[in-house]
Amino acid sequence: MSKYILALDQGTTSSRAILFTREGDIKQIAQKEFTQIYPQPGWVEHNANEIFDTQSWVMTECLQRAGVNASEVAAIGITNQRETTVVWDRKSGAPVHNAIVWQDRRTASICDEMKKRGLAETIREKTGLVIDAYFSGTKVKWILDNVPGARAKAERGELCFGTIDTWVIWNLTKGKEHVTDESNASRTMLFNIHTGDWDEELLKILDVPRSMLPRVAGSSEVVAETHPEFLGKAVPVSGIAGDQQAATFGNACLTEGMAKNTYGTGCFMLLNTGKQAHISKNNLLTTTGWNTPSGRYYCLEGSVFIAGAVVQWLRDGLGIIQSAPEVEQLALSVPDNGGVVLVPAFAGLGAPHWDQYARGTMVGVTRGTTKAHIARAALESIALQTLDIMDCMQKDAGINLAALRADGGATRNNLLMQFQADVLGVPVERPKVTETTALGAAYLAGLAVGFWKSEDEITAMWQLDRRFEPNMSAEVREKLVYNWKRAVERSKEWAED
């Protein structure tokens, strides 16, 4: 009898495979980093073949380390960095260009052009998104317009487009399945979140041939089987969700009004709004959460581009820490930020500002400023960006959050979690299993094959590790927030020229 579900978690900096038991516990993990390519300032690429090679390697490695064979795996769930765009040759399977990553800003001018054409309202109404270089649609257009011969091949039906889930499944099935799910499709700027299908008007606006697009499946259904070559036997692929939607599901935020924040490379807060798509009046995104047999669920989302990446910058860019976990002790060595505010707008500002020309800014620096103050200001910036989003979410949905569930690598940082509760003024709940992105993909896959019986069973499995209660005076909080808002204004529209 099958005892496990295997989650493939294809992230921005590494590919991972995580094996889960029926209790939702982790049996084994394998992880492999891959190359980040920065051809020009503001451009970020990945080698699509390296993405699949690392994903395939960790999949096999995870099972080997666990001493588990493929016949014990009931199904595979896939979750992935969203928006990152691959275009490949339908016949040979070869990418025509490196994958263009979600952080990449090269299509900012295409976005400006679309805004000038007065398309913002159409895009928001149909897709729930704002016009921004973040989403896949303009990246596909850029590849078709800039890779010699690509547009002609696309018109002839010879090219495929996919987000990373689609690319991984295409390769796992040796080109047999070209498929995505609604959560990923809803991040392309080509998909109508109300009809649940690709939108002809949007395809026309971005000049993308429909023949390139994958079919759109549910998030929890058997969509493919792996080619036996990979694991020695075919294993069903029965769960797909973009990383943030998967994390929402994995954190058991399955009912309307529940919210989670994932602290990874970026920071992503999602609020489950049930079966109703709320189009935001506060510059948040409306996105499909998941489409399962129980229905299509929507979320409000606020995206922060730089969260954990600010700690990587302290390590790799400034060299003030040797490893990411050191940041907590360094920040704790001072009682406060010493007046320093850091706005990590390295790739522009995400929600609710959506300023692609904002740049990183550090203010309040004096001769007395030390690396500890900068480290503390960096951690605080993660929590303060989250506060900006929560304020907007509460306005849009007309609710006051009772608590925020937190997941992702940076939740291990107790100082950050406590500071987050302090500035939000609501408790922050950290679950026992913080790998909720992979867990969400596992849940979606397991539900589709009867490994778990119901969403109620999943809700009951969620376990609390620690609850951080707000513990900051209103006066201190107000001063921090006031200085933060001033610093954000100074970071805006810097790169206009």
From Swiss-Prot:
Its EC number is 2.7.1.30. Sn-glycerol 3-phosphate binds at T12, R82, E83, Y134, D243. It comes from the Bacteria. ATP binds at T12, T13, S14, T265, G308, Q312, G409. Inhibited by fructose 1,6-bisphosphate (FBP). PROSITE patterns: FGGY_KINASES_1, FGGY_KINASES_2. InterPro entries: ATPase_NBD, Carb_kinase_FGGY, Carb_kinase_FGGY_CS, FGGY_C, FGGY_N, Glycerol_kin. It is an enzyme of class 2 (transferase). Pfam families: FGGY_C, FGGY_N. ADP binds at T12, R16, T265, G308, G409, N413. Pathway: Polyol metabolism; glycerol degradation via glycerol kinase pathway; sn-glycerol 3-phosphate from glycerol: step 1/1. Gene3D superfamilies: 3.30.420.40. The keyword tRNA processing does not apply. Keywords: ATP-binding, Glycerol metabolism, Kinase, Nucleotide-binding, Transferase. This is Glycerol kinase.
